[in-house]
């Protein structure tokens, strides 16, 4: 997929839900975030301050000084600030509390990142593929599946279409979790160092 080979992508029945609560707190505008795992426990909590960038005049987010786990927070910060660039009206004049909830174990690798990006893109009314570029990267096939909510034939963000995958053997297809989930960004960087035959891709 990273070399635009024609690929079939199929969503799982599990997903990620996002609830947005708007708060009329204009004195200090805050965006608080809580990510909840399938077992009901929080696996990330953070706060961001929303303020106007004096150079661009746009809203911009920065870390609250008390926030922890900045690795995840940094990724969220990039995604949300990119969403503001794509839609300057996003996050205007209010504070927000966001909760996300996974239907699956994060170690399964079923798309906690891509479903997050799709949810934020729908909320901000922006292009999910553009948000993906500043966060996790990749081919974008999972973004297409997440935005459509169904099967897709995929080559690139500009070359994909919906598809109905309904073979007679569909009841014999199973998901087997090997407990070998890898870091997506590291896997992509490792793949890009390899030479791939154009004949195979085509």
Placement of each model-derived feature along the sequence:
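C-terminal nucleotide
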Residues: 2, 8-13, 17-94, 101, ...
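DPxDG-like acidic metal-binding loop motif
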Residues: 108-129
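Intrinsically disordered, low-complexity linker/loop segments enriched in Gly/Pro
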Residues: 94, 106-108
